[in-house]
């Protein structure tokens, strides 16, 4: 079944399966669907501001809906991922870090260390990158301050790998009315 899901700027549904399954697209207007084999195993997934679909794990994979082709790169990721609307995809790093990936080249731009492994990644409307552990802490990373971060403690069994701030809705479009 579908594990990760997102909506593109045209309101179409995208879903990915856990590990190396299939990417699914459902057209919002016709409800017709298409599937493609995933190019690499994926855990997290997102649709970026340019309409590319990403699956994230140890390998980052970018799907181009126009050409129906994949590009991949091994980046040492692990869990969730999200794009900032400015050309950087942030993802969970496998070694207690948050990895910044260039969305054009798929190359690692930099890696920001955090105190423990974070599984969930999200970006808020102020541009802060959030990482959530699977335990009791979340970190708010300020990329404009060389990766300085604040720790938010006292969480109980925190778990997410998806958009926890609502920022990904910026890629969907403006509401009508």
Model region roles, listed by residue range:
Residues 132-176:
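Blade-level signature of beta-propeller repeat domains, shared across WD40, Kelch, NHL, RCC1
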Residues 1-7, 39-49, 75-85, 115-125, ...:
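Repeated scaffold domains used in trafficking and secretory/extracellular systems
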Residues 17-20, 57-58, 93-95, 133-135, ...:
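Short loop/turn segments immediately following the C-termini of beta-strands
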Residues 26-31, 63-68, 102-106, 142-146:
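Short loop/turn segments that connect beta-strands within beta-propeller blades
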Residues 22-24, 59-61, 97-99, 137-139:
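A short loop-to-beta-strand structural motif that recurs across blades of beta-propeller domains
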Residues 76-134:
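Loop/turn-rich, solvent-exposed surfaces of beta-rich toroidal or solenoidal domains
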Residues 12-16, 52-55, 88-92, 128-132, ...:
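Conserved beta-propeller blade signature
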Residues 31-37, 68-74, 107-113, 147-154:
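A short beta-strand motif characteristic of beta-propeller blades
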């Amino acid at each position: 079944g579908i594990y990760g899901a997102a909506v593109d700027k045209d309101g179409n549904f995208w879903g990915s399966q856990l590990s190396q399954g299939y990417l699914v697209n459902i057209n919002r207007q016709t409800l017709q669907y298409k599937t493609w084999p995933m190019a690499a195993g994926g855990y997290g997934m997102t649709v970026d501001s340019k309409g590319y679909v990403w699956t994230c794990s140890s390998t980052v994979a970018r799907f181009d809906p126009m050409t129906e082709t994949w590009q991949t790169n091994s980046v040492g990721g692990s869990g969730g991922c999200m794009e900032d609307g400015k050309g950087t995809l942030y993802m969970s790093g496998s070694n207690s870090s948050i990895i910044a990936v260039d969305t054009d080249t798929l190359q690692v731009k930099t890696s920001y260390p955090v105190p423990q492994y974070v599984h969930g990644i999200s970006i808020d409307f102020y541009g802060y990158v959030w990482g959530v552990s699977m335990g009791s802490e979340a970190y708010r990373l300020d990329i404009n301050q060389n990766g300085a971060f604040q720790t938010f403690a006292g969480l109980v069994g925190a778990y997410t790998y998806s958009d926890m701030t609502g920022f990904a809705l910026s890629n969907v479009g403006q509401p009508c009315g």
